[in-house]
């Protein structure tokens, strides 16, 4: 546990749909500056667990807290503490990439919002697509736009659900450095991934999701997904 204190706590958490669990019970505490990797086979329940940790859906039982605030889709104070990126996240169809990012920057009162947006466009290689609407983007470009928006938001907890999907190797490596830098700055990160190298580059501990949920070192977790 980080000496800077616990940020995310999940206590006897069971996740699933319509009362049916998708994986085993889990309990975990993650501190400031730590990166929790989440791994498991396809369909094991990783994304469901991540959505529950993000407060996007309610657990079947147990609880999730961030800085002591109980997770709930309707809890405004909780949502302010969390930035999450999921593949199903939506865009405003009439806004361009730049306009989306400016909306995030201004909505969170970031200093120099235009400058920060330009930095994100550059980091994710979106400068040439900055003034087009989402329907004109490739799936990879949409993914990078979602990541740019998620990483811009000031939050105690950042949750990334398979962020490596549709990213080339160079961008995956850059994303790993960015995640590590955010954690070094005090952010708590939950990283759902199938990428062993991204896990090794970023994670400080891991959850292995299956019928039973276990804690593992990044090295053990990376070996599990490399052999999947």
Describe each model-derived feature in a short phrase.
Residues 54:
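Helix-to-loop junction immediately C-terminal to a conserved catalytic motif
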Residues 62-70, 78:
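Conserved ABC transporter NBD signature motif
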């Amino acid at each position: 546990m980080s000496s800077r204190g616990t940020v995310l706590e999940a206590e006897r958490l069971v996740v699933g749909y319509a009362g049916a669990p998708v994986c085993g019970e889990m309990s975990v505490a993650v501190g400031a500056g730590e990166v929790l990797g989440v791994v498991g086979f396809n369909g094991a329940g990783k994304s469901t667990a991540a959505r529950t940790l993000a407060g996007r859906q309610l657990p079947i039982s147990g609880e999730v807290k961030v800085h002591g605030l109980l997770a709930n889709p309707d809890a405004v104070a909780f949502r302010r503490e969390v930035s999450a990126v999921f593949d199903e996240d939506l865009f405003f169809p009439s806004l361009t990439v730049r306009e989306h990012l400016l909306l995030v920057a201004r909505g969170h009162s970031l200093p120099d919002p235009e400058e920060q947006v330009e930095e994100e466009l550059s980091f994710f290689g979106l400068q040439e697509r900055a003034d087009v609407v989402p329907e004109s983007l490739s799936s990879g470009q949409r993914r990078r736009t979602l990541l740019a928006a998620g990483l811009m938001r000031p939050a105690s907890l950042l949750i990334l659900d398979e962020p490596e999907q549709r990213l080339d190797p160079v961008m995956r490596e850059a994303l790993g450095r960015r995640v590590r830098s955010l954690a070094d700055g005090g952010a708590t990160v939950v990283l759902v991934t199938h990428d062993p190298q991204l896990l090794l580059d970023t994670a400080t501990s891991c959850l292995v999701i299956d019928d039973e949920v276990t804690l593992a070192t990044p090295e053990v977790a990376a070996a599990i997904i490399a052999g999947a």
